[in-house]
């Protein structure tokens, strides 16, 4: 097996830095990325562990394809106990930082402890050091990148940094690197801030060995040709993820007015096409990617003028656009940039703001609580103030910083908060694409459109090799099995670590892995590794217990497209709400802690709280691969 498995362990309390090798048997079973991270963290994530305590580990991890010349392999994963949910925390990020960590000689970075003063890490070609960062505290991540590169005297150093929100341990704080690529979900920036760790700079020139280079090169060329010819990747290349806005609006899957409205006339003003026609000035790509879905924009004049900024992704557009009934693309760009600079996940920030606007409309929140701010749909003038307050935990922002569940609880409206297991729901409404409802309910980290982007399958993305047939997006019956299969496959993708946008066929992905590592695994192993990783990630939530919400939303919103589904979701013998979020019982779990061992492959939590075993997982091995379950 070619080199993969070098872990750098840093204890910020003691200042110790050591290197170690990850067990080859674990790599064989879990590959890398989030599944391997789940196995590495399993013994350390005790049910009573405070996610923001010095003892809580933070793990940055790559996959065996990261940094190679393979298709769209620039991503890495950050994992820890989530301060947002208290459960499994995982965030996936693109750019160049992950490949650079491997070039520097490491495949994973384990951080524990808490530095007495702010610090940053400098990792370069097999060496690592802890440096003072008090002068960086309070700086935004882009400024930190520039300062750190100057200090390490290397303009090519890649820097991952947190903003003020991470410093203040806001539960949905992000980590930003490169040209605005972010590890946004589950509050990994807060965990980093709790350790007084402002940034991690990496630089390396070490080559990555490929076991069978000629085979790998041929597979790479084949995959990239398919990418260039694929219609979906062509859309991403031409309009970015924002190009999905009008289409999702047409399907009724882009939420408006905090999931309370179906029809809206502003989608065409904030779409990827509108961006291309008005403020687009360039594109950006991650390592080894021919898609280049990133947008670069210029706003020449007006209150949001800037010479160069990251164009907003679909989630940011939906968060600060239709969610608040705002059709000003320049304002959305500005608010998304503010979230990046303050270090806040725009999905969660937009969600909690939407709830605040709704509660203001209902009279549960008044100007007395908001500090004189009037929260009216379509008026986004207060949003800039509230983003800053949230990052600083000041004023009304101190309440918003507790997330949607916390805000709802504070005003006796927890049933109105659109979240799953404490994680705010992203902007893909299950009433327009039914399968994502079950994915939200069963995702280990809470509401997640990346644990399984099943809505893409429902919209026609090829999944023939997985045995998933064409499924009507409104169909509910018989869909659970295919959601489970897709979740396992996406967990395997997160182990490699592959960008979903490439939509690499499973056979090609496995062939690339075998060529890179000199392995000989087949599709059954791939499905098993995905199921095993998902089982451990899900198992992390079981000791803590996950409880259901009370907003099933079993009816379509006013003005929704004609076929927008209402009613209830049936799965197995249970009858569960096909609503916006957890529904009446979806995702609940009150089982006692497991006694020392990870759950079996395929074991999970059913929407009603009963054990789910091996749904769509063709393996019965235990999570550590030791034998039959």
Model-derived regions, located:
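Intrinsically disordered, low-complexity segments enriched in small residues
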Residues: 1-92, 96-618
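Compositionally biased, low-complexity flexible segments
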Residues: 618-629
């Amino acid at each position: 097996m070619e080199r993969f498995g070098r872990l750098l362990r840093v204890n910020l309390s003691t200042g110790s830095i050591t290197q170690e090798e990850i067990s080859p048997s674990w790599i064989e079973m879990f590959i890398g990325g989030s599944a391997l991270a789940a196995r590495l963290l399993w013994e350390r994530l005790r049910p009573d562990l405070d996610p923001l305590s010095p003892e809580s580990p933070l793990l940055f991890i790559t996959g065996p394809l990261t940094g190679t010349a393979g298709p769209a392999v620039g991503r890495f994963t950050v994992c820890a106990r989530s301060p947002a949910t208290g459960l499994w925390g995982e965030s996936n990020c693109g750019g160049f930082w992950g490949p650079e960590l491997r070039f520097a000689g490491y495949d994973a970075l384990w951080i524990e402890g808490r530095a007495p003063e702010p610090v940053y890490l400098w990792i370069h070609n097999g060496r690592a050091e802890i440096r003072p960062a008090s002068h960086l505290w309070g700086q935004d991540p882009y400024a930190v990148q520039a300062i750190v590169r100057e200090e390490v005297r290397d303009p090519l150093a890649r820097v991952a940094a947190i903003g003020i929100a991470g410093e203040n341990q806001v539960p949905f704080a992000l980590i930003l690197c490169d040209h605005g690529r972010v590890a946004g979900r589950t509050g990994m920036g807060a965990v980093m801030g709790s350790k007084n760790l402002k940034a991690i700079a990496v630089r390396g020139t070490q080559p990555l060995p490929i076991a069978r280079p000629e085979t790998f090169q041929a597979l790479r060329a084949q995959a990239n040709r398919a990418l260039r010819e694929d219609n979906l990747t062509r859309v991403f290349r031409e309009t970015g993820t924002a190009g999905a806005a009008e289409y999702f609006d047409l399907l009724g899957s882009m939420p408006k007015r905090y999931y309370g409205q179906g029809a809206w006339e502003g989608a065409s003003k904030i779409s990827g096409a509108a961006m291309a026609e008005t403020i687009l000035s360039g594109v950006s790509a991650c390592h080894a990617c021919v898609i280049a879905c990133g947008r670069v924009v210029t706003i020449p004049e007006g209150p949001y003028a800037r010479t160069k900024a990251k164009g907003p992704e679909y989630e940011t557009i939906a968060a600060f656009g239709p969610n608040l009934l705002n059709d000003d693309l320049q304002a959305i760009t500005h608010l998304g940039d503010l979230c990046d600079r303050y270090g806040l996940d725009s999905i969660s920030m937009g969600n909690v703001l939407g709830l605040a606007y709704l509660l203001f409309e209902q009279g549960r929140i008044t100007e007395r609580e908001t500090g004189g701010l009037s929260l009216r749909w379509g008026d986004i003038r207060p949003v800039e103030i509230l983003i800053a307050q949230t990052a600083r935990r000041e004023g009304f922002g101190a309440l918003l910083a507790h997330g949607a569940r916390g805000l709802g609880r504070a005003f006796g409206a927890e049933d109105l908060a659109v979240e799953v297991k404490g994680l705010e729901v992203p902007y893909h409404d299950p009433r327009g694409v039914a399968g994502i409802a079950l994915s939200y309910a069963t995702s280990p980290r809470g509401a997640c459109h990346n644990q399984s982007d099943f809505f893409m399958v429902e919209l026609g993305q090829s999944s023939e090799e997985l045995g998933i047939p064409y499924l009507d997006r409104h169909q509910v019956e018989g869909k659970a099995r295919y959601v489970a299969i897709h979740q396992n496959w996406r967990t395997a993708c997160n182990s490699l670590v592959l960008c979903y946008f490439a939509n690499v066929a499973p056979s090609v992905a496995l062939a690339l892995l075998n060529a890179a590592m000199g392995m000989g695994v087949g599709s059954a192993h791939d499905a098993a590794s995905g199921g095993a990783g998902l089982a451990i990630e899900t198992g992390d939530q079981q000791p803590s217990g996950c409880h259901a919400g009370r907003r099933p939303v079993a009816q379509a919103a006013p003005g929704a497209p004609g076929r927008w589904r209402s009613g209830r979701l049936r799965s197995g013998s249970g009858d569960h709400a096909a609503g916006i979020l957890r529904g009446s019982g979806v995702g609940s779990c009150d089982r006692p802690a497991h006694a020392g061992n990870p759950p079996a492959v395929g074991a999970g939590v059913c929407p009603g709280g009963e054990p789910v075993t091996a749904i769509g997982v063709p393996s019965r091995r235990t999570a550590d691969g030791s034998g039959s379950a």
